[in-house]
Amino acid sequence: MSVLDRLLRGLLARPVGDLIRQALDDELYRYRVHGDPGRLHVDPTAVINNALFNVSAGEITVGPYAFFGHNVSVLTGNHDINKFGRERQTAIQRSGRDVVVGDGAWLASHVLVLGPCRIGEHAVVAAGSLVTHDVAPYTVVAGRPATLVRRIEHGEAGA
């Protein structure tokens, strides 16, 4: 292959590669909302990535400087196991299952949060964890279901 051929191939491949990279980046940082988007409140300083928010049964609030890894799901909705057929699909509680993610909280990749619950400020939820209850501020939780791993020391300067 001549130098000219390699140069032309490189020039043609670069813009296409850039477009593909941009499309992938856009998908990695786009979150989805199931339900009324007005029930989702995300502080502008929060970093969300490609999360799924289900607001069918409550509000979801994400505080300042909170951040999510990839593929985090926050669900307020659930279905009544005592219903059957179409009624099981449609009998959904419409409120009261709010989720609050506190200031500076970190939800690592593949975390699943089932409301109602509150994740305290500066708490850390380890990758792959299942949150089914409140998480205290300044704690690390992990597992399915998430349980306390340790407390995070904090002082006036770091708070």
Short names for language-model regions:
Residues 118-142:
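C-terminal/domain-terminus segments
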Residues 75, 126, 132-133, 149-151:
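Conserved acidic donor-binding loop of glycosyltransferase catalytic domains
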Residues 1-34:
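Membrane-proximal basic amphipathic "stem/tether" segments
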Residues 32-34, 91, 127:
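Short, functionally important structural connectors and interaction interfaces within domains
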Residues 36, 41-42, 47-118, 144-145, ...:
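Flexible, glycine/small-residue-enriched loop-and-beta-strand segment within the central core
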Residues 29-31, 65, 138:
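Sequence-level detector for tyrosine residue identity
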